[in-house]
Amino acid sequence: MKFLVLTDIHGSIKYLKMAMEKLDVHGCEKILLLGDILYHGPRNDLPLEYSPKEVITLLNGYKDKIISVKGNCDAEVDEMVLEFPLFPEATIKLNNHTVTLMHGHHVDEYNEDGYVLYGHTHVNKVEGKLINIGSVSIPKDSHHTYAVLSQDSLTSYDLLTDEVIMKVVL
């Protein structure tokens, strides 16, 4: 099974639509959302085509395919309009690996075995088994990014060019 991994959408319908096109491109069956879905937060400028209502409509259409965790910009009201749960953390099993999904604002407190996929800082980074896939809509390292998680690897791509940004063999 392949997963499309997105984080830090921050209400941008423009970049969400582009990212969702990658479901078919890569043959992904599920979507992993790593938080900060609708609101841009007080520290970020508005992303291009900021439209939380359109983001809600688009994502709710995929509610049966989504596993999502709550980010620091996600509020209780977001959970009322999204038709899928926002978990504090989630865990999936791939082959012999455990992969924990979290937003990342508490990643320093993580001390379990296995891999961690997170966002929050908007920067692609790998530190051991901690993997940050950047941001779909408000990158801090110049790449709008998404990732594809398979049974044996995670590959992060530039959303605009499909250039491989990083690949981690699990």
Where are these regions (language model features)?
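Flexible glycine-rich active-site/ligand-binding loops centered on an Asp-His dyad
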Residues: 170
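Conserved beta-sheet core of the metallophosphoesterase superfamily
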Residues: 84, 95-167
